[in-house]
Amino acid sequence: MAAPEDVAALQAEITRREEELASLKRRLAAALTAEPEPERPLRVPPPPLAPRAALSRDEILRYSRQLLLPELGVRGQLRLAAAAVLVVGCGGLGCPLAQYLAAAGVGRLGLVDHDVVETSNLARQVLHGEAQAGESKARSAAAALRRLNSAVECVAYPRALAEDWALDLVRGYDVVADCCDNVPTRYLVNDACVLAGRPLVSASALRFEGQMTVYHHDGGPCYRCVFPRPPPPETVTNCADGGVLGAVPGVLGCAQALEVLKIAAGLGSSYSGSMLLFDGLGGHFRRIRLRRRRPDCVVCGQQPTVTRLQDYEAFCGSSATDKCRALKLLCPEERISVTDYKRLLDSGAPHVLLDVRPQVEVDICRLPHSLHIPLSQLERRDADSLKLLGAALRKGKQESQEGVALPVYVICKLGNDSQKAVKVLQSLTAVPELDSLTVQDIVGGLMAWAAKIDGTFPQY
């Protein structure tokens, strides 16, 4: 049995340790709830991380499973601790990517995102929670990563990456991960990486599919080598329009994280000069070879003409955001606001409301008095759809006390497809009932209806 003085000493040591632990918990709680630090000047690259000579006891325990990998080992872990990675986009790709980089012990993470957390993000952007709705994505991600690994320095840049400061920022990091959601930013990040001499790990995801590759590394091509010219803006679909299953960007973000870790640890890259294609619905992974680096590439070629960053929105003809652009295809007389349509609806004036969204969106929500004919069927002049529209117009005319033709109001989600549908209806000759008929689209669509008229109507 231990002597009384030994028991007393142990009890005193336990008390001291408990007080120390309580103090550390109070400091941690204060740090997590403190106001964010002032943003560092964006034109000044962060100072390089100091090289590490050894791992601490806590680090050895924390990273013990990956330290056992002969390819990584202590040397690779020390390289990770001294590495700085810039993550452009803290959404469906950037969240899982940054999460695994922080967990693996990367020394510094720069997090660029101008957007704020929205409820519709939470199904796939796993660093953010319900309590963060309305907060900056960059700051929300940084706070979550600090909770995951307090040893990792997380620097938030809550603004859109732009040509006037992107190059200085990229020069302050060793590896860049492109997790953005728009074409202009992809070209901007690529050019900045080439001019700064940094490898770029890039991925994208939409619906059930995605792709991932490494640009400008180990003699491989850059983004411009593969895509010299941007696609026409009208051919680009984003997640807000096309949809995405959250696990798909999760898979691609994890693939990105693996490539970043290999490059940062000095293990090389598996996807420099090739691309991973993922089909989540079919469950297929496929690897394809990309074209080689182009000698005539305007940014990484033998005689480059792009020697500084440019206006990428002008170059691509689209904005550096994933927000849907509001089209202006019709004159004001061919459009009606949701407020005016609600007034018309309340008056009981006879009319036809034509919903031109795809069936999958109509299944989510609809106005009960609407007639559904998808825009795609109108565009291909589907005979059954035109008969359905003609029958609705004839029935409405017969039921109308005045016996006059009914006006048609066209609605969609945001007010873009409805304008296209009005153009189609104006050109139809196969439906006699449309001759000399008033056809207008409803500005802003059902999302404007939900925002301005009916707060209980679902938004998606």
Curated annotation (Swiss-Prot):
Q: Which coenzyme or cofactor does it need?
A: Zn(2+)
EC number per UniProt:
2.7.7.80, 2.8.1.11
Residue ranges occupied by any Rhodanese domain in the UniProt entry: 347-458
Cellular component aspect of the GO annotation: cytosol
Organism domain of life: Eukaryota
Similarity comment text for this entry: In the N-terminal section; belongs to the HesA/MoeB/ThiF family. UBA4 subfamily.
Which organism does this sequence originate in? Mus musculus (Mouse)
CDD domains, per this entry? RHOD_ThiF, ThiF_MoeB_HesA_family
Q: Which residues form the active site?
A: 239 (glycyl thioester intermediate), 412 (cysteine persulfide intermediate)
Coiled-coil ranges from the UniProt annotation: none
Signal peptide region: none
Annotated GO biological process: Mo-molybdopterin cofactor biosynthetic process; molybdopterin cofactor biosynthetic process; tRNA thio-modification; tRNA wobble position uridine thiolation; tRNA wobble uridine modification
Protein name, as recorded: Adenylyltransferase and sulfurtransferase MOCS3
Gene encoding it?
Mocs3
Q: How is the cofactor bound?
A: Binds 1 zinc ion per subunit.
Positions annotated to bind Zn(2+): 222, 225, 297, 300
Which chemical reaction does it catalyze?
Answer: [molybdopterin-synthase sulfur-carrier protein]-C-terminal Gly-Gly + ATP + H(+) = [molybdopterin-synthase sulfur-carrier protein]-C-terminal Gly-Gly-AMP + diphosphate; [molybdopterin-synthase sulfur-carrier protein]-C-terminal Gly-Gly-AMP + S-sulfanyl-L-cysteinyl-[cysteine desulfurase] + AH2 = [molybdopterin-synthase sulfur-carrier protein]-C-terminal-Gly-aminoethanethioate + L-cysteinyl-[cysteine desulfurase] + A + AMP + 2 H(+)
Described by its record, this protein's role is as follows: Plays a central role in 2-thiolation of mcm(5)S(2)U at tRNA wobble positions of cytosolic tRNA(Lys), tRNA(Glu) and tRNA(Gln). Also essential during biosynthesis of the molybdenum cofactor. Acts by mediating the C-terminal thiocarboxylation of sulfur carriers URM1 and MOCS2A. Its N-terminus first activates URM1 and MOCS2A as acyl-adenylates (-COAMP), then the persulfide sulfur on the catalytic cysteine is transferred to URM1 and MOCS2A to form thiocarboxylation (-COSH) of their C-terminus.
